[in-house]
Amino acid sequence: MCRYPHLPQTLPLVSRFGLRTLLLVLLAWASVCANGEAADKIPGLLTVRDALTLPNHPVRIDARLTAAGQSDDRPLAGVLLHLRIDGKAIASQTTNQAGQVSFDYLPKMRGTNVINLSVDPAATVSAEMRETTLCVWERRRPIVLVELESLMQPGAASSAPSAPAGSVGRPAAEPVPDAADELSKLTQYYYTVVYVPGSESASMGNDAAHTLRQWLVSHKFPPGFVAVPGTGGLSATLDGFKQDGWTTMKSGIGRTRAFADTLLQHRLEVVVVPELPKGELPRKAKGAHDWKDVRKKL
């Protein structure tokens, strides 16, 4: 007597339809199961800001996980997050009741590193992976602040770089000609750069830094620190840099009168590009016709 009575019936079935067909059916079944699991997951939003430190000095990388689409930014607790830096696994931690998590890291060398933060695949939350920047700078190197609006075509700043080129959503703002090349020359050997968004970042919510960073990368601007001003605005951001010991912040490049006025109040030199109409340029500010003229003014 056959020990497995169903086997004689199964073998002709496999022979009739072929092993390839059977494999396709199994793959389709697995795909349906996977999609069902994904549909059951809570959509989340990861937010993480750029980090700045010195070589051989510890830095804390803070992140937050909230429910996507929630107007109250409902925190998601108990979710395992994974941190990678330059592709290397560094640490894993679970979000607290506020949806927050902090990682401590000790960089050894000067440079710019890519921070990668992701939700564990087995978690009940599904969130897009986030990349941010770890800037490891030396204090003696001068810092130049660059207003985001000075990098965008006139008239495009109001639309904001809400999406990187090629992505779904509103068209991304186009960069000013020569801005990326000229800024790369400034930062190649001398300056480090801090990008400062203006009012356009308010409409992006918690995802502002990520959106702006994607836009900068997609248009080949040099890597730098993206400083999204908080409740105190740009003035409080500048005070924060100085309190942390970054006193080599000497100059800035911008487009608006408000940006120029703020930097002058903090005793920084500022170049406005393109030059504002006569009578609108602050007395101690310098005007540049275009980005190719900026280096001559610094």
Segments (PLM) and residue ranges:
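Beta-strand-rich structural segments
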Residues: G44, L54-D73, V79-L81
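C-terminal cap/substrate-recognition subdomain and adjoining C-terminal extension
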Residues: M204-L298
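Short amphipathic beta-strand segments in non-cytosolic proteins
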Residues: L80-A91
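Beta-strand-rich domain onsets/edges
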Residues: E37-R60, L134-E138
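Edge beta-strands of extracellular beta-sandwich domains
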Residues: V125-C135
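Glycine-centered loop-to-beta-strand initiation motif
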Residues: T94-P107
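Short, aromatic- and glycine-rich surface loops/edge beta-strands on solvent-exposed regions
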Residues: R110-A123
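Conserved, compact domain cores that house catalytic/ligand-binding motifs in diverse enzymes
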Residues: R139-T231
